[in-house]
Amino acid sequence: MIQDSMMTETDPQVAKSPEVALAVRNLNFYYGENHALHDISIDFPARRVTAMIGPSGCGKSTLLRVFNRMYDLYPGQRATGEVIFDGRNVLERDLDLNILRARVGMVFQKPTPFPMSIYDNIAFGVRLHEKLNKAEMDARVQDVLTRVALWNEVRDRLNAPASGLSGGQQQRLCIARSIATRPEVLLLDEPTSALDPISTARIEELLDELKEEFTIAIVTHNMQQAARCADQVAFFYMGRLIEVDSADRMFTNPKQQQTQDYITGRFG
């Protein structure tokens, strides 16, 4: 696990709960003058899968990108409020974003392997944050590729370009690359939307295994996937959090009519 002074100062007013990995409080987000997220407050339980559902443009992916400050890469975007991680608000301007993004990994909708070998895709982020010798790096590469069920498929071609892998293999490689830096939180933005059913099933099985170690937040438009994979489900609509509950209760007895209408296909 990567540690740094960016996360060691704990405000007694927001001391970290061992049961909550991310605590969002009164979060608002703006694309220029467009108010995209409105007063979002939600807890992400540690070592659980939280699925975020809702129609396109409702703010799910925007929220995901707030957690590791990806929005900082684009001018005119800003967030207010709090996202408490390890006792500190990640929106603070003096945060070390390289360390934050190593501890809060992200996998995108479309597989994005780096234009380098399979081995170097895994080693790239590790080299930025740790000084491992070759044997240690080899072990790290094998470990994460094994964990995403990719090792046996690529062990004899680690030096081959990652672009030669299938779409499903590339996405598993991207997950392996994200967990290679040993983050505490893993963010996934529709990670299976571009994959075939077999590859999708493999990713879903993988999530069930990974949540034993990582806190996972996943954006999905597939409500069957949310029901299969998630412990907690949050429904968003027009930039607002409408309801959050356990997956079982959300899909069998939602409290809000908007939630009921969405999950039954009346809109969205």
Curated annotation (Swiss-Prot):
Membrane disposition: Peripheral membrane protein
One Pfam family per UniProt: ABC_tran
EC number, as in UniProt: 7.3.2.1
Residues annotated as binding ATP: G54, P55, S56, G57, C58, G59, K60, S61
PANTHER family: ABC TRANSPORTER I FAMILY MEMBER 17, PHOSPHATE IMPORT ATP-BINDING PROTEIN PSTB
Name recorded for this polypeptide: Phosphate import ATP-binding protein PstB
Domain ABC transporter: residue ranges: 22-263
Annotated gene: pstB
Reactions catalysed: phosphate(out) + ATP + H2O = ADP + 2 phosphate(in) + H(+)
Main localisation: membrane
Keyword Membrane: yes
Organism: Gluconobacter oxydans (strain 621H)
